[in-house]
From Swiss-Prot:
Substrate binds at T49, C50, N51, R52, S109, E114, T115, Q116, Q120. Possesses an unusual extended V-shaped dimeric structure with each monomer consisting of three distinct domains arranged along a curved 'spinal' alpha-helix. The N-terminal catalytic domain specifically recognizes the glutamate moiety of the substrate. The second domain is the NADPH-binding domain, and the third C-terminal domain is responsible for dimerization. Belongs to the glutamyl-tRNA reductase family. It comes from Brevibacillus brevis (strain 47 / JCM 6285 / NBRC 100599). GO terms for molecular function: glutamyl-tRNA reductase activity; NADP binding. Catalyzes the NADPH-dependent reduction of glutamyl-tRNA(Glu) to glutamate 1-semialdehyde (GSA). The active site is at C50 (nucleophile). Its EC number is 1.2.1.70. This is Glutamyl-tRNA reductase. Pfam families: GlutR_dimer, GlutR_N, Shikimate_DH. Homodimer. The lineage of its organism: Bacteria, Bacillati, Bacillota, Bacilli, Bacillales.
Length: 454
């Protein structure tokens, strides 16, 4: 069995391509069911976010799984394979496992170290479990990846340093105020960056929001998002009297506030500290504001300097995580390699039991006068001999299967004990049983569709 991943993300595909491969909530469940009906695919999970669409499958053979999954993507979304082949990445086995650990821990995210993706991976896994498209392999792999991601954020600082300008402003504010609880935010201008910064401040405890804008209607629209108030630029001096934090991004061609305008306001405020963030280019706030006591002014360059420093810090943490991920891969692949042991052991015991049963039949034919008690003793003794003979080979097989040469060991063991025919028969029986289950499931779905048409 092979583990396979096919996907598109923000690194490989522009948004106009990614948006063609977006699963709806209902669509994901139906897609999982359809994909799981494919003969070669034993398990499947679909991970869909605004930045990535990924399909994880456990399949009989990697090349067949690749073809089926590629065709599935094309047919499900009605897109020719040629249109997305250059944007599609395909990873197998250890590469696919490593990719999942990187995705879960936020290492592969647009904003390195973000934690939202962990919840999305968990939701994708739970949906697969709910619709019974996961089995032994993915139940183990995804649980391990989710547990690792939680540990990564606990044991490293991968998500602790701001790597966006808007969040860097929040970090600066915390250094000045300690806490934003009860603080009042004044947003000057209704630009996107102002909104993002205000959103972060609001999430960190700031309670009152006022939006000042040249157009009152736009100010009102933004203020509503934070259940705040709005005012015009003419009312800015009055709004500054009660503000603790000012975020400015108006897009004006000149300064909207300087020392001359703010000095008398600071007197009325009794020089209560004022934290000001100018994220406009060109700048909104005159640098001469630095001359005023208790005015803490930061512009876009200050914030980008913090971001650059934090990006470097996250990169160092990412190197630590890479080492941790390699350890996780070894742990999983060691377990995964032992999965091939169970069918071999079962086949070996099957063969040994057949030989023992045949021997007992011959004894009964040649010695028909043996009592039931005597036959019981012989049967028990021969079974004991079989178990003793199998014990050491089975123990050694389990140990050697967990090494880097595990696959070769399993292959040699299979040939040494001539288990090919038994394994082939058991595999065929499993395929028949699986096909029967899929036919039953498909029939039930058709009945439901006929009863409850769209």
């Amino acid at each position: 069995m092979d583990i396979l991943l096919l996907g598109l993300n923000y690194k490989t595909a522009p948004v106009e391509i990614r948006e063609k491969f977006t699963f709806s909530d209902d669509g994901t469940a139906r897609a999982l069911h359809l994909l799981s009906q494919t003969k070669s695919i034993a398990e499947c999970i679909i991970l869909g976010t605004c930045n990535r669409t990924e399909i994880y499958v456990v399949c009989d053979q990697a090349n067949i799984g690749r073809d089926y999954t590629r065709r599935f993507l094309a047919e499900w979304f009605g897109v020719e394979k040629e249109q997305f082949k250059d944007h599609l990445y395909i990873k197998e086995n250890e590469q696919a496992i490593e990719h999942l650990f990187r995705v879960s821990s936020g290492l592969d995210s647009m904003v390195m170290g973000e934690t939202q993706i962990l919840g999305q991976v968990r939701d994708a896994f739970l949906l697969g479990q709910e619709h019974q498209t996961t089995g032994t392999v993915f139940n183990t792999l995804f649980k391990q990846a989710i547990t690792f991601a939680k540990r990564a954020h606990t044991e490293t600082a991968i998500g602790q340093n701001a790597v966006s300008v808007s969040y860097a402003a929040v970090e600066l504010g915390k250094k000045i105020f300690g806490s934003f609880a009860g603080k009042s935010v004044l947003i000057v201008g209704a630009g996107k960056m102002s909104e993002l910064t205000a959103k972060h401040l609001h999430a960190n405890g700031s309670e009152r929001v006022m939006v000042a804008n040249r157009t009152l209607e736009r100010a009102q629209l933004l203020a509503e998002k934070f259940k705040g108030d709005s005012c015009t630029m003419e009312q800015l001096p009055e709004a500054l009297l009660t503000a603790d934090i000012v975020i400015s991004s108006t897009g004006a061609t000149g300064y909207v506030l300087g020392k001359k305008e703010l000095a008398p306001i600071m007197k009325q405020r009794k020089h209560r500290p004022l934290f000001m963030v100018d994220i406009a280019v060109p700048r909104d706030l005159n640098p001469d504001l630095h001359d005023l006591d208790n005015v803490f002014l930061y512009d876009i360059d200050d914030l980008e300097g913090i971001v650059a420093s934090n990006v470097a810090e996250r990169s160092r943490e990412a190197e630590r995580l890479d080492v941790m991920i390699q350890e996780e891969i070894v742990a999983f692949t060691t377990w995964y390699q032992t999965l091939g042991v169970a069918p071999l052991i079962a086949a070996l015991r099957d063969k040994a039991n057949t030989i023992q049963s045949e021997a007992m039949r011959k004894i009964e034919n040649k010695l028909p006068n043996l009592s039931e008690r005597e036959m019981h003793i012989i049967r028990k003794t021969t079974k004991g001999i079989v178990n003793q003979l199998l014990h050491d080979p089975v123990v050694r097989l389990k140990e050697m299967a967990a090494t880097k040469d595990g696959e070769e060991v399993l292959d040699i063991f299979e040939k040494m004990f001539a288990l090919e025919e038994i394994l082939e028969r058991k595999e065929q029986e499993a395929i028949w049983a699986n096909d029967k289950n899929k036919q039953t499931s498909s029939s039930r779905e058709q009945v439901l569709v006929s009863r409850f048409p769209d």
